[in-house]
UniProtKB/Swiss-Prot annotation:
Family to which this protein belongs: Belongs to the Glu/Leu/Phe/Val dehydrogenases family.
This protein's UniProt keywords: Mitochondrion, NAD, NADP, Oxidoreductase, Transit peptide
GO cellular component: mitochondrion
Species whose genome carries this gene: Oryza sativa subsp. japonica (Rice)
One BP term from GO: cellular response to nitrogen starvation
Gene coding for it: GDH1
Protein EC: 1.4.1.3
Enzyme class: oxidoreductase
Enzymatic reactions: L-glutamate + NAD(+) + H2O = 2-oxoglutarate + NH4(+) + NADH + H(+); L-glutamate + NADP(+) + H2O = 2-oxoglutarate + NH4(+) + NADPH + H(+)
Location(s), subcellular: Mitochondrion
Record-given protein name: Glutamate dehydrogenase 1, mitochondrial
Length: 411
């Protein structure tokens, strides 16, 4: 089942639990606007190249639409639509005043020079600048994009609308970015994991963790979990996987990964088959890479007691059912990885106020939001007798539905 089908299925189950009117249910599912633009740029060699860009603006009942822009060769309308919808529910679960959006350009950023990436970003911004804005739609980095990409968007947008630092988040700090933003998603994973474990009388210390993915989210999660006393025993990235039953030295692994462009060859553990990583014996499994990695083919072999979804849509619905029967608790992506968009909200607030927070305030506020989000999800679980995923979806959908009705938008 692809991401769009799975997200829509979860929404429909939540709508049924909430008893939503069928017309309201339909209106919440259909995107507010879908944008498709052609972006032609001159390459460094003088030839012209054309790319297709997308922006799906799903819902704005609770505030400006919010979501990343990704550069990847497999970007397609269905994926962007699914991720935009997911952002609507995610921002509602986090209880930040946003709706959901997502964007992307079908390209391979590794095959483009910095100059070509800049030209592509500026052309894309020119095509959508009148459809985004501080109080309309606020983009952010995603796969294949970063703070520099946001700086280019900010600059190009400002040519049309005047200097507007709040039009994007995830910017460099020198252009109004927030302290703590780089670590935000990984730190949010830590706080969410702490909340889940505390519910069962446990803490981070002494728990054995396996993490799939060692990019921004996975590496920060590993570092912060290790600092909190957790034992990270296995990690993988695109180059390979490494295991040390006594716990990996995360600081050394990060240094090795930076110097060698991956964890392959790290001498602080044993190399293992990346395909076996998800089924390693552990207490907590954190998929922090691609979607759909936990499926009906490997769900029965998973030995973790808890799964924290740091990636978007890492668990297929079929696997969900298998793991539920095994008693595995899954903290869903729309709660577990909401730290990034939460600190993006803090950045937006700081830009509008013209007042910068220190990093301690950012981190303290993030912990408050993540802990409260978990508590709110648990309350929905008790009210509707459902698991954590459906508790999160019912919470998010209910908040958006209430805002829609209050604004008089129901069909």
């Amino acid at each position: 089942m692809n991401a769009l089908a799975a997200t829509s299925r979860n929404f429909k189950q939540a709508a049924k639990l909430l008893g939503l009117d069928s017309k309201l249910e339909k209106s919440l599912l259909i995107p507010f606007r879908e944008i498709k633009v052609e972006c032609t740029i001159p390459k460094d060699d003088g030839t012209l190249a054309s790319y297709v860009g997308f922006r799906v603006q799903h819902d704005n009942a609770r505030g400006p639409m919010k979501g990343g822009i990704r550069y990847h060769h497999e970007v397609d309308p269905d994926e962007v639509n699914a991720l935009a919808q997911l952002m609507t529910w995610k921002t509602a679960v986090a209880n930040i005043p946003y709706g959901g959006a997502k964007g992307g350009i079908g390209c391979s950023p590794g095959d483009l020079s910095i100059s070509e990436l800049e030209r592509l970003t500026r052309v894309f911004t020119q095509k959508i600048h009148d459809l985004i804005g501080i109080h309309t739609d606020v983009p952010a980095p995603d796969m294949g994009t970063n703070s520099q990409t946001m700086a280019w968007i900010l600059d190009e947008y400002s040519k049309f609308h005047g200097y507007s630092p709040a039009v994007v988040t995830g910017k460099p700090v020198d252009l109004g970015g927030s302290l703590g933003r780089d670590a935000a998603t990984g730190r949010g994973v830590l706080f969410a994991t702490e909340a889940l474990l505390a519910e069962h009388g446990k803490g981070i210390a002494g728990q054995r963790f396996v993490i799939q993915g060692f990019g921004n989210v996975g590496s920060w999660a590993a570092q912060l979990i290790s600092e909190a006393g957790g034992k990270v025993i296995a990690i993988s990235d695109v180059t390979g996987a490494v295991k040390n039953s006594n716990g990996l030295d995360i600081a050394k692994l990060m240094k090795h990964s930076s110097e060698n462009r991956g964890i392959k060859g790290f001498d602080g553990g044993d190399a293992i088959d990346p395909r076996s990583l998800l089924t390693e014996e552990c207490d907590v499994l954190i998929p922090a890479a691609l979607g759909g990695v936990i499926n009906k083919d490997n769900a029965n072999e998973i030995k973790a007691k808890y799964i924290i979804e740091a990636a978007n849509h890492p668990t297929d619905p079929e696997a969900d059912e298998i793991l539920s029967k095994k008693g595995v608790l899954i903290l869903p992506d729309i709660l577990a990885n909401s730290g990034g968009v939460t600190v993006s909200y803090f950045e937006w607030v700081q830009n509008i106020q013209g007042f910068m927070w220190d990093e301690e305030k950012v981190n303290n506020e993030l912990k408050t939001y993540m802990t409260r989000g978990f508590r709110d999800v648990k309350e929905m679980c008790r009210s509707h007798h459902c698991d954590l995923r459906m508790g999160a979806f019912t919470l998010g959908v209910n908040r958006v539905a209430r805002a829609t009705v209050l604004r008089g938008w129901e069909a």
